[in-house]
Amino acid sequence: YQAAFDNKGMYTGEVSNNLFGVQHQYSKNGKDADKIGWLFDYGKKESVEKNLYQAIIKEGKGYEEVNDLRFQLILLTMLKQKAGNEAFTHLYREYRKLANQEGFDANKYPLPDLMNRYYGETSGYDFTPVLQKWKLYTDRIQAEINRSKGYKATASLADIVSESQLSNARKLVDKDILINSNFEMVDNQQIAPLGLKGSVKIQLNIDDINQLKGQDLLLKEGSKVVKRIAITGKELTVQDVPNGVYTIEIPTGREARYSVDKHYLYIKEKENHLTLKIERIQHSDLVNSSFQFLGLGDDPFAELRTNLNQQQAVFHITSKNPHTYYANKKYAGIQVFDENKKVIFDKEIEGTNVPTGQKDIPLKEAYTIKIFHAETGNRLKSDDSNLINTKSNENTFVVTKYGLENTSLKNNAEDDLLKKIDQAAERILANKEILESAVSEMKDQLWVAIQSLSNNNREIYLEKYQSIFK
């Protein structure tokens, strides 16, 4: 029952196995399991709930940051409960199919994305806002697929009802939910009878507001549009929005393609604020790469992601003890050089006692990245399967407009991009809702990627995928 997706994209080591225990206890004992089970510390539910609320809501911690197995189990229990047991079964069933494919690499299937896909397919709910609230990385493509299919956004009760109203909200919804918590997952209609409403000020951070002016920003519940907000400037104010979580749809720029950093709006019964970072797409997501650093037991301990559109890379260390056999010895490292070969980032990672955290690193065309891993052969992974020289502990990459080129493998970055374009196009063509949508970041990213190609390739690929852009 502990599948290979454990600890992929989120810590589940002593959490996922207990999901089965929770299901057994509550199916056998009903709500009395609060008093006899480990989930709420054998009857100390009030104290557990208070501490979890303090950590998540008041201190703003994410899933990993709470660093408490019980808290993490409660959150995953609430997610599973909203999706339903059939969705949990569907997740395992579909994962077995993936795992039996030739060349299967478990590191390419993080658990947050698996849950977002398979829980959504079964339940019709979009769990992207929940996972993002927990500060877990989620695949933008899967999130867009969820929205395109009209899945309803869902949220923890505590995220859409203020503390002073939680008691009333719990009285309303608890009777219909087996395992109760301030973090039980609900949709907007479940709390609508409370009659709670709030206002929101939306700030649009965009280089040219005229690209959007005169069009509408939409607030949606699944596929249903509940509010149309005329875009008159960079600051929008909306009154009397019922409490809940809403999917946001931003129109396409008139003359340029844009990406949006947030697609969900949370409303509580107060004045709410949301800033949307709307960036012109000059470099497609398809030119980006990610590297996963694995340690003892093949457990991930760090990740590097490039983002040429934002001219940066993000290096995230998630485990303080990558490999105990390498205590006081260099186990991994990253160096980044600018176009003049000046070192602008240098990080060495030993096997133990490593400070965790995230670092943003400047990154532009003509920069160089050097990655060291003492066990590159089987413990340095990439979403680009042919990008790593597994025979060398050090790999050097040059940043080009098409992506990364490994100086020892001599890969052609434009050829690599063509393959990514084909894969992205196939994914769009396989999703009728996205193919027919007038607003799609997947299509915008594909368009920009094709436009960046050399002249001959650009003409070939525009014709090849003209049906996507008609």
Q: In which residue ranges do the predicted regions lie?
A:
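Short, aromatic- and glycine-rich surface loops/edge beta-strands on solvent-exposed regions
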Residues: 245-255, 263-265, 364-395
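Beta/coil-rich, acidic/histidine-enriched accessory regions frequently appended to metallopeptidases
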Residues: 108-294, 299-301, 405, 454, ...
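Active-site-proximal alpha-helical
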Residues: 45-143
